[in-house]
Each structure stands twice: as C-alpha cells, then as structure tokens.
Amino acid sequence: DSSESRGLGDVYKRQVAWGYARQADDMGVDIIQHCEVTGFDVVNGKIKGIRTSRGDIKAKKVGLCVAGSTNILAEKLNMTLPIETHVLQACVSEPVKPLLDGVVTFGAGHFYISQSDKGEMVMGGDLDGYNSYAQRGNLPTIQHVLTGGLALFPFLSRLKMLRTWGGIMDMSMDGSPIIDKTHIEGLYLNCGWCYGGFKSTPVSGWTFAHTIAQDQVHELNSELRLNRFSTGHLLDEKGLGTKTWIG
C-alpha cells in the first residue's frame, strides 16, 4: 500500500543532535565541548572518574559511548573489544532542482542517495575496507560507490561532486551493537553500531540510560551483551560486521 510510505524521508542529523543537546541542557545536563578524555580513575575495580584535557571529573558511573573512538578509550582501561574501526565516506554533488523526496538504497550495490534541502545529491555506501582512525578516505571507494549510483541514476554522470568526507565507524564482529555493563563496576558500554546507529538513537539512549541507572541490562538489550562474543551467541545480521573471518 503506497499510503504506508507517505511522510517518509531523510533527517538532518545535526539538527537532531542539536535538539537532544538543547533539551538536555534545559534539564541541567552539562555539555562540555572540546574536552578530550585522556584517562580513567579506577580503584579496586571501581570507576571513580575520568581525566580530561580540561581537568578531572569525579563520577561513580561512567558511560562509554564514543562510536569510532571506542577502542582508543578502551585501551586506556586495558580492555580489548571485538570492535574494528573503519572509515565510511560520503559525498555531495552540486545542487539541482528537487527530484527525490526520500531516500533510495541499492542493497546489492551498497549505495544510498537522498537530496538535501539545498538541492545537493547526498550519496554514500561502502566502507573503505581497512582499519583507520583518519576521518578521510580514498578516491577508489568513492568511484566504486558512484558506479553503483550510475546504475540506478545515469543522470548523475553529468553532475559535479562538490566535496567528500569520512567518519570513523565502530564495526562489531557480528554487525550488532553492544549495550552492557563491563567488568569494571560503574563503567557501561554502548558501541558497535557499525554504520547504522543514527536511526536507533532513541532506543539506544533509552536502554543505555536504563542500564546505567538500574545497573542491569534492559530486556530490549539483553541479547546485545558483550559476553556473546565469548559464548558464541552471535546475532545473525546478514554478515553486516567487518567479516574478519573472510580470508
């Protein structure tokens, strides 16, 4: 029924983040920008606070939710996680008149496209395929992604690309996230969302808040625990992880 898809579209991610930040600020949450975490204070297996570039912050509970930087901070806690960090690129074209009012995805070709409110065609797809913390990628991946785009929309060949950029993704080994407690009392983990975490922001935040406040996982994230990688109870997500078992 075509009526079921009416009203669907894309969301400007920065505006969503700003909306959450504004509401959090109104509720008394301190948001400290340009503040790098440099270490953690752990005493007798309990978290006592964090060390930052702008001073120490004492806390009985700490939530680690830093996407592609997860392994960097985990190493400071002597934790080894089943996470790999990869670069994911995107690009935008010169603006054109409105022609797409939603998002089109090409699963087999690993390509997606939408149109911004300024008229640019926003496109992306595959990971760069190697481990990196650099927030930039290589041209061959963009060429590969746009080849898939041309298969869907040949007119794209006549457009100029304005810019490309990259972000670092925390890729779990089975393609599913981790929302759980850790072996350190008071330290909680939310990571492994790969390249699809934005759309899950509301439920991710809600279940993570419950896990921190109650010191126990919620029913909704009970299967997203860290120990599934040691027990073998991995989640079947169509091989959306990093595919490290493929030679």
Q: What are the residue ranges of the model-derived segments?
A:
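Single conserved hydrophobic/aromatic residue that forms the stacking wall/gate
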Residues: 1-12
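General small-molecule cofactor/ligand-binding pocket signal
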Residues: 30-32, 162
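C-terminal catalytic lobe of FAD-dependent flavoproteins
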Residues: 151-247
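A conserved short coil-to-beta-strand element within the FAD-binding core of flavoproteins
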Residues: 33-46
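Active-site lid/adjacent beta-loop-alpha segment flanking the redox-cofactor pocket in flavoenzymes
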Residues: 95-186
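N-terminal Rossmann-like dinucleotide/flavin-binding domain of flavoprotein oxidoreductases
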Residues: 17-29
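Central helical "cap/lid" subdomain
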Residues: 52-101
